[in-house]
Amino acid sequence: MENSKISSKRVIGILVAIVVLLAVGYQAVKAGEKPPAVGGVAPDFTLTSQDGNAINLHDYRGKWVVLYFYPKDFTSGCTTEAHNFQRDLAQYQQKNAVILGVSVDTADSHQKFCTKEGLNFKLLADTEHKVSDEYGSVMNLGVKKLSARHTFIINPDGVVVKEYLDVDPGKHSGEVLAALGELQPGAGSK
């Protein structure tokens, strides 16, 4: 009887600790900088891709950019989201859109992730979380910072035209494609 009371108290304590940690993590996302305003120019940046090349957002002027931030390579939600972007890659290309993924992982981690998962779009290493900060996409977990799961659609003039701050990895690529269809009248018929 005494052991079951201790076990119950221990389980309740663990559950309370988990809820507190989740709440702190959620609030930490809100504690960073604000995302760029829809209608404003997307902050420019240069980051290293999985192949070691410097990628500058400005180099994509003239194209639509799907800039998506995600927490971590090789995790279930991030892998699902990346697989769906890869599955739909040809449709993005038909819409004159490129996909750029950003996380705080290293370029080497991105290379391994792309190789293992068959990803053929750029993943950018924001190891010092400066770009994630600038886009209001940081989860500060105290001892570690991760990119938050946010996405920005940037038009060919470099203007943020849509943002997603609450992303379901399983549905997100379809939502972004639909938004591009609305933002680009006739894009599907090109």
Where are these regions (language model features)?
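Structural micro-motif
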Residues: 119-121, 138-141, 145-152
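A short beta-strand-turn-helix
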Residues: 36, 45-65
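N-terminal targeting signals for export/organelle localization
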Residues: 1-48, 186, 190
